[in-house]
Amino acid sequence: MKEYSSDKIRNVAVVSHDGTGKTALVESLLLTSGAVDFVGKGQDNKHIMDFEPEEIKRNVTIQLGMAPCEWHDHKVNFIDTPGYNEFHGEVRAALRACDGMLMVLSSTSGVETDTVRAWDYAVELQMPRMAFINKMDVDGADFFGTIERMRELFGKGIMPLQIPIGEGADFEGVVDVAKMTAFTYKDGQPTEVAVPAHLIEKAQEIREMTVEAAAEGSDELLEKYLEGEELSLEEIRQGLREGMISGRVCPIMCGSATSRIGLDQVLDRMIRYMPDATKKVMTATDAETGEQCVVHVDKPLTAFVFKTLLDPFAGKQSFVRIFSGELKEGDRLFDVNQGVEEKWGKMVTLIGKQQIPVSAAKAGDIVVIPKLANAKTGDTLTAPDFKVTYDAIRFPQPLYTVAMEPVKKGEEEKLASAVLKVAEEDPTCVVVKNAEARQLQIDCMGEVHLEHILNKMDRKYGVQAKLVTPYIPYRETIKGSAETESKYKKQSGGHGQYGHVKIQVDPLYDGSEFAFVDKIFGGAVPKQYIPAVEKGAKETLDKGLIAGYPMIGVQVTLLDGSYHSVDSSELAFKVATSQAIKDVIPKAKPVLLEPIYEVNVFAPDAFMGDIMGDLNSRRGRVLGMEQSERTGISVVKAQVPLAEMSDYVTALRSITQGQGVFNRQFYTYEEVPHKQAEEIIAAHKTQE
């Protein structure tokens, strides 16, 4: 594959809801372009793009895949993405690397949840969008119904460039409304024909919409249109391109990936309407000054690692988008985030898992660099004399928390290492570092994602894990005040031990976890032993007095005490204080606290009642409901105990038929109800 200049490169993220035929479309586009000489069939589990064992087993895309093709002296880099929502992090990574998005919709299913989710993220990134309505040859295909629904959700910028000739078993081609000509297909090859008579009126109606949208692309075209002059085909295309790049217009095409109908026109329109890399202007941060700067394609080399793959045998592969300059074999490469110069030997491009050597790549291209020792997903790679960083990818928040331990005893370190390697590949698998829990916890996207993680650790790193109950960081506190005194005295011949303290405990109401007050007068307890008293109190409270959880919100006041000139020591006062704390806390109305989270649930209005009922069943407090920015979507705001959220990802998906999402953040600690507290305390006692 030859080297292409920046203006001849198109980077396209292909996204959809699961089951629309997205991967089949990518592979058929590769076949149409001549990049491959065969395509797999999903039912045979032989996709070029889905080659990981888990993908073959499930017949779904799990991780993003790369595939370039050449078409009319241009290079198109396709990034195929997973459709299942638990792997949406891969979609976000792909969109950061690309300049345009191709949405794939099924003509029978229409607009589905994850299509909307991808659209919203592309809008957030101000990314041009194009759509392909697939499966027009399937029974129940409804092109115009899908267009109508898209307009309801995404606005009047949804602009069909084609209409189908027939639907279902009668589907045989497409009408190009701008040219007012038609194409029928046999074995993927087009034949230009006249527009069928029964479609002329509809095609002219849509053409008028298209011309009007194109005219709004510039003042010059709009003036010409309003004066009643006819726009030329080139002017229509120019206006549509400007409209798409601005995000005002989303061109719509249709066809069939499996029958290869309309695919040549998809490639034509990608080149015609998708922005090239010269249009990409990036904002970066100067690594030395911290100031924002603008990076054009003609600046020195900058590149961004948007995906990392690890293989126990082949090593690391870093997927890299070049935003400026040029990368050639032998060039120096600096990882600004890690602060090191990377040693590297070669770069390749991929079609599925097939590697194709690349000697040089210009701004706008996407390559894979093997065996970068330090680079991680989200890192910026630059020329050594032009150190800037790009913002990291904003991945979805993983909210499904699990704890695990190895099936085989003694493999704890092996399991921890495997989890960290999986997390390096997949930023939506987050290892929770919590020394208090004394267990390995991860946050992931859901049950399917978790199963994929467990299978990958077994297959790649030879370690099996079993799930255990995740640790909930309960806390203990007191609601009352109490006093006590304790004397630690030990004499066994020779030097003994003596420490005597009188203390008071009180609840703190300012949010502090611990406070120590010294009220000793007249040297009843010498000053050199006061720190030991404080340490003894703090360490004992940290171990917990009710159920083994740290006790917070407690003020300990040293009121009085006594000492022995020979036998007293720091240890003696520390032990005496510990005994006093254990004695006084039960008198101070101790209670158990649990973490409460603020939760925002986004879902269609029709599910609001069921969502609020479910939150109430989880001991949640529903604070209110309001409309979101998207029509028909509401937001429920609630406060919910963390202990009741372990299965909420799965439950919400079930309640809303996959259309609900939520986020959460820690809010406060509150007292655990009596019944639940008794259960927690009883469980602790059985483990002692």
Please provide the spans of the model-predicted regions.
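Structural and coupling elements of P-loop NTPases
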Residues: M1-E688
